Amino acid sequence: MAEETQHNKLAAAKKKLKEYWQKNRPRVPAGVNRNRKTNGSIPETATSGGCQPPGDSATGFHREGPTSSATLKDLESPCQERAVVLDSTSVKISRLKNTIKSLKQQKKQVEHQLEEEKKANNERQKAERVLEVQIQTLIIQKEELNTDLYHMERSLRYFEEESKDLAVRLQHSLQCKGELERALSAVIATEKKKANQLSSCSKAHTEWELEQSLQDQALLKAQLTQLKESFQQLQLERDECAEHIEGERARWHQRMSKMSQEICTLKKEKQDMRWVEQLEWSLSKLKNQTAEPLPPEPPAVPSEVELQHLRKELERVAGELQSQVKNNQHISLLNRRQEERIREQEERLRKQEERLQEQHEKLRQLAKPQSVFEELNNENKSTLQLEQQVKELQEKLGEEHLEVASQQNQQLTAQLSLMALPGEGHGGEHLDSEGEEAPQPMPSVPEDPESREAMSSFMDHLKEKADLSELLKKQELRFIQYWQERCHQKIHHLLSEPGGRAKDAALGGGHHQAGAQGGDEGEAAGAAADGIAAYSNYNNGHRKFLAAAHNSADEPGPGAPAPQELGAADKHGDLREVTLTSSAQGEAREDPLLDKPTAQPIVQDHQEHPGLGSNCCVPLFCWAWLPRRRR
């Protein structure tokens, strides 16, 4: 299309140029044609534009005067016309050039327009393709949206059905809730009635328990003083043992240095004796090999003074070794007895601390029913950890004492057995053959490095023993100081407020009176009062245990424990656990409160978790009981 329009435009431009040339072509005047016809003899002048040469004109002018002037005028007029025509043609040519330039510019513009149209067409085609792709994607998206709408409609229908089911279930649950609230209100009313009945009985009982707790406090103070005195005695005994061990250590160093010197001298003497015997034997051989046989001379035997001196030294060394063995055995026995006494004292201290802890927890339970349970748990955990550390240290001390004593005994017995063996060698055979009195054998003592290693190992064991004893002292001091501070603080607090919060918590009617206030504190106090009322018979066993402990505290001092107590402790383990569990079981069978609904969960908790009674009775029991009452 663009090429056809271009060709058409070019054809139209050519036509316009032809018409313009035809219109503006110069026309020849009539006089010129006539001159050409008349003057046939001079065609050159006519063709050359009517201009004659000067000679001819002159001749003609001279020849024909009047006619020449007329012809000149006639010739001048066409020349002028031709000049005008030439001017007009030059103007026309310039115009034509301008028109050509304008046409070229138009052509360029047309070509530029054609290129732009081509570009626009290409862009339109690209846009059409992009639009087609977009239309296809939109169609696909439309189909996907239709499928999503279908699925959404199905899910909406499903959710509507589920919402209907949930509404039905909610109605059913609301009905059940109303029924449960009615049942709970009935149960609460019955429990209030029972609690009102029990509160009247529990007031007198709690007053009596408070009096008993004050009496127990006095007993505990007396026991604390006894414990302090026994602890001071233990410290003195330990100091004496430490001094005795240091003295024995110095003596042992001196004896070992003397023994090492004597062993070195004995080694040298033995080597000299053997060397002398070898020389004598070689001399006897040489004498026998001589030509003249001589009667054999008796071998050179050491003098009786030297033999007696050697025997005395051997007897002295054996006696010293035996005395050292006896001393070591005596030291080990003393250490064992001291460890047994320390263990017995620690067991008694532990029992007394447990009794104090139980009594204090009981008093604290009566005074503060709710706010101190977490602190007691943390304290019990810390005390258990300290007790475990003390037990581990005691076990380590006992094992290391036994190991050190056994190693010492083995070393000493080995030395004695080596010294008791008979001497070997040629000299011994020769003396036996002579029939003389054989001296006691020389001791085959181990070399110096081995003895030094044994000494260093023994000293290391002694150092470790001393370090462990110091560690045990520090742990026991920390443990006793901690419990003394805690017991003094708690007893002071309870004595400063004897009739305040305890009576309010125990005698105030439990959570039945506090239930009117509608708070968590009332519920906690009521739970504590119910726990005290249900646990009243269990406290009788605890008082029996305290009486037995008081009787055991009046027995002889810690240095000489009764064998019956030790046997009972070995058979039955912890006295506190046996008495508490037996009393609790015996009274649980005869307790009339077990048939009541408020006391049954308490007994179930105690039966399911028997470890709770071994550490702390009342606080953990009430701590396990409070969450159920809060629920």
Curated annotation (Swiss-Prot):
InterPro entries: GM130_C, GOLGA_cons_dom, Golgin_A. GO terms for biological process: Golgi organization. Keywords: Coiled coil. The keyword Coiled coil applies. Residues 38-50 have a biased composition (Polar residues). It holds the Pfam family GM130_C. It comes from the Eukaryota. One of its GO terms (cellular component) is Golgi cisterna membrane. Residues 568-577 have a biased composition (Basic and acidic residues). Residues 1-72, 422-451, 502-523, 551-610 are annotated as: Disordered. Residues 507-519 have a biased composition (Gly residues). Residues 85-149, 209-247, 303-419 form a coiled coil. Belongs to the GOLGA8 family. This is Golgin subfamily A member 8R.
